[in-house]
Structure formats: structure tokens, C-alpha cells
Amino acid sequence: MEVMSHLVHWVFLAVYMYELNAELISHLHPPEQEISTDSCVFPFVYADGFHYSCISLHSDYDWCSLDFQFQGRWRYCTAQDPPKCIFPFQFKQKLIKKCTKEGYILNRSWCSLTENYNQDGKWKQCSPNNF
């Protein structure tokens, strides 16, 4: 009977150590997070607002939605994610077909993020490559 009692204790110890080892392995080697390669959608709707570029709302890092109406699908932004300029776009009484310095007091080129800047007021500064 005493041998059986020792055997039961050893079995419990072995099971406990196995579970502890499995838990330790899962902490040391967590499953890798899948990184989405889906494109950001601009504009997207989140928190009752339209967003025309990556945002850091509720996050430490910029992110974007993968759907027009945010449905929980998102990814962190990269340098390749800024929204694209929309050409042509309406500015004042003109139809602008490329980045322009008109109306920018810092004399830098800019573009609209929508077809009608007059209506939406969404813009970004152009990069040296004008995108």
C-alpha cells in the first residue's frame, strides 16, 4: 500500500511538472502575431468620424482600418500607408491636377485627399515624389 501511495505522488508530480513545462514553453515561445498585408482603407469611419490618414486613437501607435466602416479589422501603419493625393481636385474656382503651393502660407506643395477640397478641407503635404 505504501508503494502505491508513493507511486500516486510521483504520478501527480510528473503531471504537475508536465503542465508547468507546457505553460513555461507557451510563455517563452508565444505564437507569432500574424501581420496583415491588406491595404489600409482611406477614408475610414471610426468613433463616429471619418479618418483620412492613420490614427493613434486608443493606441500608442498609428493604425488604420482595413474596412471603410471599422469592423475590428485593422493593422499598424507603415511609412507606405499615407493616403494618396486625389487628382484632379477642386480648389477655390480651379481644378488642380498636381501638387500645388497655392494657398499654403509656408510655400510648400500640398494636395487634397478628396475630389473637392472646398467642401471637405482634407489635405496633406506632398512628398518630394508628389504622392
Swiss-Prot record:
The keyword Amino-acid biosynthesis does not apply. The keyword Acetylation does not apply. Epididymis. Residues 1-22 form the signal peptide. GO terms for cellular component: extracellular region. PROSITE patterns: FN2_2. Disulfide bonds join 40-64, 54-77, 85-111, 99-126. Residues 35-79, 80-128 form the Fibronectin type-II domain. It comes from the Eukaryota. GO terms for molecular function: heparin binding. Keywords: Disulfide bond, Repeat, Secreted, Signal. It is found in: Secreted. InterPro entries: FN_type2_dom (IPR000562), FN_type2_sf (IPR036943), Kringle-like (IPR013806), SP_Capacitation_Regulator (IPR051666). Its main location: secreted. Pfam families: fn2. Belongs to the seminal plasma protein family. Binds sperm in vitro but has no effect on sperm capacitation. Also binds gelatin and heparin, but not chondroitin sulfate B or phospholipid liposomes. This is Binder of sperm protein homolog 2. The gene is Bsph2.
